[in-house]
Amino acid sequence: MTRRITTLLGLAIASLTVATAAQAELRVKCEVRSDRSTASVDGKSVPNGNYYAVLTSGANSATSTAQPTIQREVEIDFSSRPRDINKGATPLAADFIVGGQATGALYTEAGALVATKTVACRVR
């Protein structure tokens, strides 16, 4: 009986994770200049809770702190600009973005992957 309940609970959790990932929309934007890198990873239509993002470009990787949703949306910023960092952006090196592209991944606070997306960065 206990094994059956455990199995059913595991299936329910797996189904919830798949449903969360299927419904979520992920927008990743990035910009690179000679003296700075900036990016944002934004989740829309995600269940209320806390989420963190991982931004990668080439061999570089940065992980944000967990941020709460506001009306089922979460916006996570990354930047090498001191002004943006002072406003809460996750710090990046000025040369963080390489090869003109970056990948953003959104995770639940518990570490479940919600969505991932690779984009070409705006080069200025």
Stretch-by-stretch model annotation:
Residues 25-68:
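Short, surface-exposed binding/anchoring microloops in extracellular/periplasmic proteins
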Residues 9-17:
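Bacterial N-terminal signal peptides
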Residues 60-81, 118-122:
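Solvent-exposed serine/threonine-rich low-complexity stretches and specific carbohydrate-binding patches
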Residues 88-93, 111-124:
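Edge beta-strands of extracellular beta-sandwich domains
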